[in-house]
Curated annotation (Swiss-Prot):
Predominant subcellular localization, coarse grouping: cytoplasm
EC number: 3.6.5.3
Function: GTP hydrolase that promotes the GTP-dependent binding of aminoacyl-tRNA to the A-site of ribosomes during protein biosynthesis.
Recorded GO MF terms: GTP binding; GTPase activity; translation elongation factor activity
Catalytic reactions on record: GTP + H2O = GDP + phosphate + H(+)
Subunit structure comment from the entry: Monomer.
Region (G1): 19-26
Organism: Roseiflexus castenholzii (strain DSM 13941 / HLO8)
UniProt similarity note: Belongs to the TRAFAC class translation factor GTPase superfamily. Classic translation factor GTPase family. EF-Tu/EF-1A subfamily.
Protein name per UniProt: Elongation factor Tu 2
Length: 401
């Protein structure tokens, strides 16, 4: 059966839900698809479908990143429901890196919690350009003054992390009330908060300027073998465009030279695409490449446009204890994990002459040597993590090798 073709009629924007565990991110994601489905602009995706890995449902926390698709009158959206639990922040880093804008979900009765702060900080580090807030579970609070206090606290938190806290839209509502409503009338009062939220997302999150004219690059998130067709790699196109017949290179995560291959097909949401462009989440079919020859963390790129490097200089901000960082300094030879695009790689740190240690809160230029070369270039941002928490954020200032 021929696949349906994906029609590009509206601007495409990548958004995602972030926030503390159990504040309602997954419920809200399901509620958005439900309400927009009433307008024929989405397929309803249930809470259980989003939260669908067996080890998750027992604890009711989301681990995997789930993509859903929906439309408003203005735009086509791909929405990721990001993991909320601190243990799964690793996915948050790779997930938040995919957002043109975030929906921060905060439970009104609880207010901002540690993971709320950590996610806002991460959103800042991975440069999520804009954020709107959904103040959830407001039906459990009847005190208007308390609600206003929670809003004030949220605006202050956002401002402290470099977001324009005074102007960010905060939409109040109940995701559960919308999700559990039996009404098929789009004008039912319990659906209004979802419509208001989508309106805020439409208006406040800017349509991203896509880097379409630059050389093609796509960080690889996943690899699948498809019987009789070959190997498919999936990811979000960072820049440029790709179509059937293009020659591409698989770069990084190896000490060997990049492998060349030819694209034999491009798909988005199970529909074939004439060409994938920057910002699209796509699957790319590769000719003559075995499933074992490609892995998450590599990039697919226009030949010669990016090279793998293991040594680079970087400007790094080391988080303070209050920001969830280290409590103690670190020294030359420190070996944390570097989160670069879709991968984490161990690297050793050298400090500038005369610098003997780095304190939490310092901003420092350091030399990093990764244990395996990765596709990097000047200006690339990354996070530094150890023991399950972010300890620094950095940007590549110069390639050394």
């Amino acid at each position: 059966m021929a696949k349906q073709k994906f029609e590009r009629t509206k601007p495409h924007v990548n958004v995602g839900t972030i926030g503390h565990v159990d504040h309602g991110k997954t419920t809200l994601t399901a509620a958005i698809t439900k309400v927009l489905a009433l307008q024929g602009a989405a397929q309803f995706v249930s809470y259980d479908q989003i939260d669908n890995a067996p080890e998750e449902r027992a604890r009711g926390i989301t681990i995997a990143i789930r993509h859903v698709e929906y439309q408003t009158a203005k735009r086509h959206y791909a929405h990721v429901d990001c993991p909320g639990h601190a243990d799964y922040i690793k996915n948050m880093i790779t997930g938040a890196a995919q957002m043109d804008g975030a929906i921060l979900v905060v439970s009104a009765p609880d207010g901002p919690m540690p993971q709320t702060r950590e996610h806002v900080l991460l959103a800042r580090q991975v440069q999520v350009p804009a954020m709107v807030v959904f103040l959830n579970k407001v039906d459990m609070m009847d005190d208007e003054e308390l609600l206003e206090l929670v809003e004030l606290e949220l605006r202050e938190l956002l401002s402290n992390h470099g977001f324009p806290g005074d102007e960010i839209p905060i939409i109040r509502g109940s995701a559960l009330a919308a999700l559990s409503s039996a009404s098929t009338d789009i004008n039912a009062p319990e659906y209004q908060c979802i419509l208001d939220l989508m309106n805020a997302v439409d208006e406040y999150i800017p349509t991203p300027v896509r880097e379409v004219d630059k050389p093609f690059l796509m960080p690889i998130e996943d690899v699948f073998g498809i019987k009789g067709r070959g190997t498919v790699v999936t990811g979000r196109i960072e820049r440029g465009k790709v179509k059937m017949g293009d020659t591409v290179e698989i770069v990084g995560m190896s000490h060997e030279a990049p492998k060349k291959t030819v694209v034999t097909g491009v798909e988005m949401f199970q529909k074939t695409l004439d060409e994938g462009i920057a910002g699209d989440n796509v699957g790319v079919l590769l000719r003559g490449i075995e499933r074992t020859e490609v892995e998450r963390g590599q990039v697919l790129a226009a030949p010669g446009s990016i090279k793998p490097h293991a040594k680079f200089k970087a400007n790094v901000y080391v988080l303070k204890k209050e920001e969830g960082g280290r409590h103690t300094p670190f020294f030359p030879g420190y070996r944390p994990q570097f989160y670069i695009r879709t991968t984490d790689v161990t690297g050793a740190i050298s400090l500038p002459a005369g610098v003997e240690m780095v304190m939490p809160g310092d901003n420092i230029e350091m030399l990093v040597e990764l244990i395996v070369p990765v596709a990097i270039e000047e200006g690339l941002r990354f996070a530094i993590r150890e023991g399950g928490r972010t300890v620094g954020a950095g940007v590549v200032s110069a390639i050394v090798d």
